[in-house]
Amino acid sequence: LEQWADWIKKFPMKDMERYGWLEPEGTKEQKLNALLNFFGVSSPDSWDAVWRATNVAYRQTRRFRTTPEAVSAWARAAELEAEQLDFEVQDFDENRLRSLLGKLRNQTTEPAERFVPTVQELCAGAGVAVVWVPELPQTGISGCARWLADNKALVALTLRYKTDDQMWLTFFHEMAHILLHKKHRCFIMDNADQDLADNVIDPQMQREEEEANRFAEDTLVPPSDLHTFIQKSSFSLESIKQFSEKLGIGPGILVGRLQREEILGYNQGNGLKRKFNWTIGEKDSAAL
C-alpha cells in the first residue's frame, strides 16, 4: 500500500470529493480503493496502462501546468456523467448531426436550465453524449471530444471563463472534431480562441485545431453575416443586440466574435455576455 501513497497524492482528491465523484475517505487504503473504483481499474498499474496510454490530442498552452492524473480524472468523470444521461444515445449519424447544427445554434439564446436538456436530447439522437463537468485544478480544460465506441461520441464541457461566447465556441469546436476528424482520438482543448502559435502541437494537430476553430466561428456567426454587420460600421450595444436577434444567436456570441476580430476591445460589450456558474448541491454534486 505504501508504494501507492505518492500515486494517490497526485490526484485532486478534495475537489473530486467536493464534486461528488468520490466519497470522502480517511485511510490510504480507502482512498486507493475509491480511486480504483472511480476509474474502473484493478490497480494503479492498470490505470497507467488504460489512461496514460490513451491517445490524447491535448491542445495545451505553455501558460497552464497540467498533470495526467488530473486530466484523466476529469475525462473519467465525463464518461460517468454520460452514462447517467436522461436520454439514450443512439448510433452516430453524421447527416442527422449536421442537420441539427442550426437548432443547436439557436440554443445560444436560452438560459442554461433550458438549453442543457435540449442540447443533450438533440445530440443524443444523433449519437453524441453531451455533458458539462467542472474543471479540476491542473487541467486547464475548456472541452473534450472523443469516441466512446465506433458508433457513439462524447463531448464534455467545463465552464472555463464562465461566459456564453466561450462555452458555445468550445461546444461547436468539439462538434467539429466529431464531424471532421479521426475517430479513436481524444481532443482536449484549453481555450477555443488561443493563438495556435503558442501551442506545442504537431502540424496535423494544428490543422485540425484551425479547422475546428473556423467551423465553430462560422457556425455561430456565418462569414457573410459578419461582413454585413461590419460594413455598417455601427457597433453600439443596441446594434449588436438587434443584429444578434436577427441572426438568432445570443448577443454575447456576437460580442465575443467581434472581440476576436479586434473590432471590439476585450473590455467592450461584456455586459451582453451571459455568465454561468456551477452550483454545488446538497450531495456535493455539481450542476450548471
Residue ranges and their predicted role:
Residues L1-L288:
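Active-site hotspot residues in diverse enzymes, especially metal/ion-binding acidic/histidine motifs
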